A protein has these predicted regions:
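Short, hydrophobic transmembrane alpha-helix segments
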Residues: 12-15, 36-46
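Membrane-interface helix/loop boundary segments of multi-pass membrane proteins
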Residues: 207-209
């Protein structure tokens, strides 16, 4: 029996949800541990954000293909000739035996697009700047630095909960659902809007920083573009896109046939469970950005630098912290 078959056998729980959830979360912590060891030894944070993006990509792909891998390699049903399902099949010939559902492909793709875009942006930024000031003190302590990687594995796992749960649904269960639901449209619309907002904010900030390095302006803090309507427009975009993913996933997971297929109990427990699995993602992102590592760290830094400046005080007073000022 190969190592892969052994791992599949070890995680072959009765519950379809656990059969996908446990290996996916375990993979997140394993990947982070693999990057943590050399980073701690070298006291170097250069690959921290890159490892986060790679973990998102790997865990998403694993959760999407895990049912097919089980069908291919589990000893009781092993069939080496079984090929992995096509990502295009849900759109060209939906409903095939063992085929993925279009919702699984689209939401997994949404995560992958986001992870590639943000990961490349952050990796390019640290290559240009040479370091990440967040880790100036943390990387000196092996325990604290290891904790940062552990926290990142937790971040990935919680953010991906709605996608992991959706990808755990057996293919046959989707036949009981309509081809398209209002929650699909709403969730994808919120995701696209949030993704566009985050991209625009990051590009505006990158251009502003580049122009400042080139002496095109002497502004000390950014108040133009999306920063004129929100103090943290990139965070607003990120919270929004994860809310969109959660909404689209929850609209499917809350259906009774899907809950039965996942092995969840009836009554109110099933809907509450899938709603919690879905919305823990944007809830955790909001908590992390607004209360832990995002806004508090940035605000402390900028208040210390510019807190005595009248223009900075006016900008903080007149600009919403998160939700954009539309009018």
């Amino acid at each position: 029996m190969s190592l892969l078959q052994s791992l599949l056998h070890l995680t072959n729980f009765k519950s379809p949800l656990l059969r996908t959830l446990v290996p996916a979360v375990s993979a997140a912590y394993a990947i982070q541990a693999a990057f943590a060891l050399p980073s701690i030894f070298a006291q170097n944070e250069r690959f921290y954000d890159f490892s986060g993006s790679l973990t998102y990509l790997s865990v998403t792909a694993l959760s999407l293909y895990l049912p097919a891998l089980r069908a291919k390699y589990t000893p009781t049903v092993a069939n080496a000739s079984t090929s992995l399902p096509s990502l295009l099949a849900p759109f060209t010939s939906p409903g095939g035996m063992g085929a993925l559902n279009w919702r699984q492909v689209v939401l997994s793709g949404a995560v992958i697009f986001w992870a590639v875009r943000l990961g490349s942006y952050l990796f390019q930024r640290i290559l240009e700047e040479g370091k990440d000031s967040r880790f100036d003190e943390i990387k000196k302590s092996p325990a604290r630095f290891a904790g940062a990687f552990f926290a990142q594995a937790t971040w990935v796992s919680l953010c991906l909960m709605p996608v992991i749960a959706l990808n755990a649904v057996p293919a046959s269960a989707f036949a009981a659902l309509p081809a398209f639901k209002a929650s699909d449209a709403l969730g994808l619309l919120v995701y696209v809007a949030g993704f566009a907002f985050e991209i625009t904010a990051d590009r505006q900030k990158s251009r502003w920083l580049r122009e400042r390095r080139e002496k095109a302006h002497d502004e000390q803090f950014m108040t133009s573009g999306l920063w004129s309507v929100s103090q943290y427009p990139n965070y607003f975009g990120e919270i929004s896109l994860w809310t969109g993913i959660a909404t689209a996933a929850a609209g499917t997971l809350v259906s009774q046939p899907i809950q039965v297929a996942l092995g969840l109990s009836g009554g109110v427990t099933g809907p509450l469970t899938v709603m919690a699995l879905s919305y823990v993602s944007p809830a955790f992102v909001s908590f992390l950005l607004l209360k832990v590592s995002g806004v508090p760290l940035s605000e402390k830094k900028y208040d210390k630098r510019y807190g005595d400046r009248k223009d900075y005080q006016e900008w903080k007073k007149n600009t919403p912290k998160l939700f954009p000022k539309i009018f």
